[in-house]
Amino acid sequence: MNNFYIKCLKSKKVESGSIYGQFVIKSLHPGQGITIGNLFRRVLLSDLGGTAITGVRIAGVRDEFSTIPGIREDILEILLNLKGIVLKSKTNDLKFGRLKIKGPAVVTANCIQLPSEVEIVNPNHYIATITTSNVLEIEFKIESGTGYKLAGQTFCKKSQDYLQIDAIFMPVQKVDFKIENIYDNSNDLTERLFLDIWTNGSMSPEEAVSSASRFIISFFSSLLENKLPQETKESENKTLSAPKNPHTNIAIEELHLSVRAYNCLKRAQINTIGDLLKYSPEKLQELKNFGRKSADEVFTTLKNKLGIVLSN
């Protein structure tokens, strides 16, 4: 059994507000680097919990296509801005926040009144501009979870008066890894695994690695402590379902399209990449107010960001 260990090589804040950290795991046997690297990457991106705004109730607003007199942004733009607020919480309970501000004023995240157990990581994050003496009043619904949840998947159907927001609970934004082969003092071939981790600031890369390690240990411990149930003949005869496109549930907001292209897609109820893949290039250009320029923007963004080409 090899005595491998992990060490933090560097950790620093970057301009976007993210925190970057680099780690190395040494003394791995050949072939272990790719296994451990993939395992850590998967857990860091998918299984760590976080907190996010999942819905808002704005005074005088009924739907996301509305506008508010005296507010520079429309509701869709405000919802997109709110999605970028990074929160961290000491509890996983459902919580509420409030904002009430009279203009003229520039509204940022630090204007939101929150429970004492919730902290805003990026308090200077821009929300909206009030150009007149009007009042902007918003109530926020805040939840904890893992991964990425589309609007409508996060809270109960009783909250019909809330405008729902796609929630990014993931504290880890990006993970890269690479493997180096080296010879130890005994001239045996070993591997070094380098992990590069970027978080949104709600936790440090060191905390992310610790949480991921605990998750992995807990997962495999359960396999040791519990007997696996016997497979029935019916379950043995079931075939595996076809793998889904990994990009299907990604919201179109992640494409960072122009406001015109984005609004056209939302009005056509195209909310995710999966919805977008149902359209051929010709059918997409038939959408109302969706011209050739917007279509080219969507095609180029899909190809460059996700490697997706819409089929005819």
UniProtKB/Swiss-Prot annotation:
Region (Alpha C-terminal domain (alpha-CTD)) location? 243-312
Would you say which domain of life the source belongs to? Answer: Eukaryota
Choose any GO biological process term that the UniProt entry carries and state it: DNA-templated transcription
> Which GO cellular component does the record give, naming just one?
DNA-directed RNA polymerase complex
UniProt keywords, alphabetically: Chloroplast, DNA-directed RNA polymerase, Nucleotidyltransferase, Plastid, Transcription, Transferase
One Gene Ontology molecular-function label: DNA binding
The record ties this protein, via InterPro entries, to:
DNA-dir_RNA_pol_insert, DNA-dir_RNA_pol_RpoA/D/Rpb3, DNA-dir_RpoA, RBP11-like, RNAP_asu_C, RNApol_insert_sf
Start and end residues of each stretch annotated as Alpha N-terminal domain (alpha-NTD): 1-227
Q: Does the keyword Plastid apply?
A: yes
Task: Tell me the compartments it is located in.
Answer: Plastid, Chloroplast
Enzyme Commission number(s) of this protein: 2.7.7.6
Instruction: From the UniProt record, list the reaction(s) this protein catalyses.
Output: RNA(n) + a ribonucleoside 5'-triphosphate = RNA(n+1) + diphosphate
| CDD domains in UniProt | RNAP_alpha_NTD
> Which HAMAP family does this chain map to?
RNApol_bact_RpoA
Which NCBIfam families does the entry mention?
PRK05182.2-2, PRK05182.2-5, rpoA
Domain comment quoted from the record: The N-terminal domain is essential for RNAP assembly and basal transcription, whereas the C-terminal domain is involved in interaction with transcriptional regulators and with upstream promoter elements.
Could you say which protein family the record assigns here? Belongs to the RNA polymerase alpha chain family.
Biological role? DNA-dependent RNA polymerase catalyzes the transcription of DNA into RNA using the four ribonucleoside triphosphates as substrates.
> What interactions and quaternary structure are annotated?
In plastids the minimal PEP RNA polymerase catalytic core is composed of four subunits: alpha, beta, beta', and beta''. When a (nuclear-encoded) sigma factor is associated with the core the holoenzyme is formed, which can initiate transcription.
Protein name as annotated: DNA-directed RNA polymerase subunit alpha
